Amino acid sequence: LKTAFPLLALTMENMAEQLQQRFKPSNDEDIYRLTNALLNDALQQYIHRAPLTTDNGQLPQTSQMNVTLFAENLPPGPLKTAFENDFVRSKPTLREYVARLQRWRDRYEESLDRRPKRQHLEHCSHYLVEFQHQKFDEVEIPGQYLQLADNNAHFERISRFLPEYGLLRSNGMCNRRITVLSNKGARYAFAVQLPSARYCRREERIFQLLRLLNTVLERKIQTRKRGLAFNVPTAVPISPQLRLLNYDEAFVSLQDIYERHCKEIGIGKDDPIVAWVEKMRATWDGGSHSRTNVDFANLRMELMEEISVKMISDNILTNYMTRTMASPADLWLMRKQFTLQ
């Protein structure tokens, strides 16, 4: 590429360098991401040890090492002192460890959500603001070569970057969202994931599989008539630590709907998991007399039904769709379309 198209390669390298250097997460965003990683690991341990009647509830050695290493890498100050007091010096149990991580995560979520949702791009990268004047060659919109197209004759090129970028918080991470204007006037929004998750390469292979399945669905008359297709976002790896993910504001994940429901009824998003573990520990007495796998499965079903009634009702998605529709006619049309599909 550098030999055949040196100006194109130079332009792409400059653009990738700006994204990698100028869009690094702040200290608060890094702490929030790592706190979520520690909490997810702790919840897995908590769930796995729920039916063990001989469990002493102590924090695993690996978790102690991880949280100690995390505390050592924090900048000196009140934040590091408070974190060490909560997790290192006090020697918490696994239950206390989970509760304190939840409290720290919630604090950072509130702090990050108070930030302005839109920022000026010139405060972050002056090069991207003047990209249309500083580029040496035309650059195509990222991700178009992932399409199953015969040639690139119809591919769109980057005209310029919009002067504002957005701040996103989703799935335990904070990202920046940049918007690119193409030479045909279309807008493409990309979430800058830095650092990208460790499972992102596996995720990209799944995306490619779904694109192949979409071509199969498109060839079938019944699926094409119903408009059935997988919604596959475009993921473009820039470097081992950076990738661009196509972001469409028209789509909302089930996780976001669930978190909104938990906020409305005043519970934490991890409270159903904690409640399940606590009731399992209080009910499961496998040490007193022998129990079979059938008993264990029945107990799990009973606990799931109880939590479904008290915390997670079966009409969460229905309530969300009812609130977001502009009129009852829109809701009826959506239900009709879903039924036809």
Residue ranges and their predicted role:
Residues 1-177, 187-189:
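Noncatalytic N-terminal accessory/assembly modules of large enzymes
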Residues 138-340:
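Conserved ATP-binding subdomain of kinase catalytic cores across diverse folds
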